């Protein structure tokens, strides 16, 4: 197991504990409390996947954070805040395209790491384009919100979405999932292309 994956989980556990203490003192607003609840479910899922105890991970995470804070000066903190890059949100799809319900005649679903891939195997001999909404940081895809495959007529025939229980996918996870989706659609003699925005960052 990648040690960075473990240490990231440990720090996330401790930071969740700190945020929980803030909520207990009634200092958190509604979005803060909502994120707290969602992140609790996420941490339980990650802990189960990694085989790590959350209480133990929280204690180790506290030690990591305390060590960093001991070395951190106020000036360094100011510089970090000033130089931290902001992520950009890029959209291929409209809100309607993202929220539209769709149905599969021959459904196929596959989980690839932290991503769920769904496609309709009944689709044949179509020209298909992949569109996605995602955030970008440092010139790379940071977080996939949703990817969908559309026919020229606008019908949705495939989708890649993050699993709520396994957040934290990487650029490589997204690339692999796109490869699986394209392979599945091309199997039925469909022609698949990727949007220019997605090509640039994924």
Curated annotation (Swiss-Prot):
InterPro entries: NS1, NS1A, NS1A_effect_dom-like_sf, uS15_NS1_RNA-bd_sf. A motif (Nuclear localization signal) lies at residues 34-38. Gene3D superfamilies: Influenza virus non-structural protein, effector domain, S15/NS1, RNA-binding. A motif (Nuclear export signal) lies at residues 137-146. One of its GO terms (biological process) is symbiont-mediated suppression of host type I interferon-mediated signaling pathway. Residues 1-73 are annotated as: RNA-binding and homodimerization. Keywords: Eukaryotic host gene expression shutoff by virus, Host cytoplasm, Host gene expression shutoff by virus, Host mRNA suppression by virus, Host nucleus, Host-virus interaction, Inhibition of host innate immune response by virus, Inhibition of host interferon signaling pathway by virus, Inhibition of host PKR by virus, Inhibition of host pre-mRNA processing by virus, Inhibition of host RIG-I by virus, Inhibition of host RLR pathway by virus, Interferon antiviral system evasion, RNA-binding, Ubl conjugation, Viral immunoevasion. It holds the Pfam family Flu_NS1. One of its GO terms (cellular component) is host cell cytoplasm. The keyword RNA-binding applies. GO terms for molecular function: protein serine/threonine kinase inhibitor activity; RNA binding. It comes from the Viruses. It is found in: Host nucleus; Host cytoplasm. Upon interferon induction, ISGylated via host HERC5; this results in the impairment of NS1 interaction with RNA targets due to its inability to form homodimers and to interact with host EIF2AK2/PKR. Its main location: host cell. The keyword RNA-binding applies. The dsRNA-binding region is required for suppression of RNA silencing. Inhibits post-transcriptional processing of cellular pre-mRNA, by binding and inhibiting two cellular proteins that are required for the 3'-end processing of cellular pre-mRNAs: the 30 kDa cleavage and polyadenylation specificity factor/CPSF4 and the poly(A)-binding protein 2/PABPN1. In turn, unprocessed 3' end pre-mRNAs accumulate in the host nucleus and are no longer exported to the cytoplasm. Cellular protein synthesis is thereby shut off very early after virus infection. Belongs to the influenza A viruses NS1 family. Homodimer. Interacts with host TRIM25 (via coiled coil); this interaction specifically inhibits TRIM25 multimerization and TRIM25-mediated RIGI CARD ubiquitination. Interacts with human EIF2AK2/PKR, CPSF4, IVNS1ABP and PABPN1. This is Non-structural protein 1. It comes from Influenza A virus (strain A/Fort Monmouth/1/1947 H1N1). The gene is NS.
